[in-house]
């Protein structure tokens, strides 16, 4: 009888443990059978993102832009458009991006720039890799790991999905 009670108690304890995983339906690894979120949710970087904070080499330069948007497309291409404050021409960049499987590093390879000055697209190859500090369905927060851009040692970006 004592063994039966212990056995039944064990079943109740084990049965009450919920399945852990990602229970956010907005995540790309959502599992509807999960009852306890374990912090492993992964979110898509695809879509339109708007700049909230841009810190370059320790200086907050967010206010130097009237607009700053990046569009991540499902073919791993991106388009970045920004309008410097007081300017009338957007500067457009395009290229490809790679987000690693664990969503911890995001690499951009710029292929072209257009200053919208009548000269069209000009080839420019620049590679920048960022550490993804946070990626949710609403926020992308990243810090520069490496770049080909001379004289740039640190970048912190916070973007909001629009």
Segments from the language model and where they lie:
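Primarily marks secretory-pathway-exposed extracellular/lumenal segments that are disulfide-
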Residues: 4-8, 14-50, 57, 63, ...
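Contiguous, well-ordered beta-strand patches that form the walls/edges
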Residues: 56-60, 77-141
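Signature of short aromatic-glycine-proline-rich micro-motifs recurring in repeat-based ectodomains
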Residues: 67-71, 128-130
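Conserved beta-hairpin
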Residues: 70-78
